[in-house]
Amino acid sequence: MRGTEGCFAGENRGWRAVYLDIGAFRLYNIPMETNMKKRMAESIRGFRLPRYAEIPTVGLYLEQTIRYINAHLAPLGCMELTGSMVSNYVKKGLIPAPIKKQYFPEQIGYLFFVAVAKNLMSMEHIDLLISLQRSSYTLPVAYDYMCLELENQLFHRFGLKDALEDIGITESEEKTILRGLVSSAANVIYLNSYFEQMRRERME
């Protein structure tokens, strides 16, 4: 991102340049045709990440783990993982090592988080955020909060709800940081969806 100036030049369709507040990644002034808004909203309507208690406990091999995670992330369009990525995260100590080559809820929960964060933060910063989480909240609590907040932010960005909900009953610095990360991810997903819809319109 290049500061808080317009990051994308407006073209002759009448929409103005995108303005991103680096602190909150808020979007402004992107008028769109109604049918385009509807298509974007429909693409995300059924999105839901599995909660921690819903992640398979039987143990999944690497390729099964990749398919499981990517199937849930597919509606977002830009967060897929590959086997080499996962192996690298394990090698760097970013996520716990598999047990007898199998991945369980602990590893899978962290992989969902890394998938959301990897386009926004360096691996070093992701590692620091995971360390912060471990010292503050259990993984099931932190992971489920991420799921709820991501769905909350996405549905608001895509016009499926009028206002953001307050997720959780406590406030902390760690929670504020995670909320900011999730908000940023929702904006990136929104922008990718917007430009993909524009590309499709031009091809029609």
Model-predicted regions and their roles:
Residues 24-134:
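Basic helix-turn-helix/winged-helix DNA-binding cores
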Residues 132, 136-204:
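Intrinsically disordered, low-complexity, charge-dense segments enriched in Lys/Arg
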